[in-house]
Amino acid sequence: QVVNRIDVLYESLALKQKPPFDEMVYRLGEDTKALDTKVAPLKSLARAFEKTAMTKENRFDSDRLLDLVRGMLVFQTMEGVAAALEALGNSKDRGWTVVRMKNRMRKPTGGGWADVLLNLTKNDDNQHFICELQLVHKKMLVTREDLRGHDAYDDFRTAAEFLELVQEKAEAG
């Protein structure tokens, strides 16, 4: 995305793109028979600042905040995930373009989370504001929600980011 001011990202872009993104996610969930469709509130400003502070390069640059607007489709089977990916292959027809994909099924995060993460932009947005969509197998959510694994993961992620920052400063002298 081309905007690097967090206030503009929130006030002008995130608030503008959230309604059409949410609509697209719900429609995609219906079309692909997702088990569950989740759209999140805007990422908190505190977490957004935390993310920009913890980046190694270009600290506090907000142009890398790609998940202020986000959603999730949950599928019973991997075939469902594949159906959503196929439908998103034609996302330009839905008014959106996939600009990045991370297959974290193949390589899970350090905390063990596995999904397919997609970044999309609305075709008519000349600011190229990026939204995030996660395609998730239902079994991943058992750990995250039913066993309260996400709270533990949040704590782990924040601690790991902080330790990485401290190590970086120590190595820099």
Each model region followed by its residue ranges:
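Long beta-strand-rich cores associated with HINT superfamily self-processing modules
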Residues: 53-173
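Charge-rich, low-complexity segments
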Residues: 1-65, 82, 157-167, 171-173
